[in-house]
Amino acid sequence: MIAVDTNILVYAHREDSPFHDTALRRVAELAEGSAMWAIPWPCIHEFLAIVTHPRIYAPPTPLDRALDQVDAWLESPTLAVLAESGHIG
């Protein structure tokens, strides 16, 4: 399983990124493919914080558009969101 980090999510989303085309193509391949892939929950939080921050991007991505992007990723039937389980041992 491939886990996608924050920077790849940001590059795939932000058209002004020099890595946009490559990242977008790779995330689309994962989302549309048959193999399981993952996004760690903290990376979703980081993605939202980064792309909507006005000191990082001018203009920043509007929150509703950033949330729509997250929703689109979450619609992939092969996506697993990685989070702490609370299970110890």
PLM feature segments, named:
Residues 15, 41-45, 71-89:
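Acidic catalytic patch
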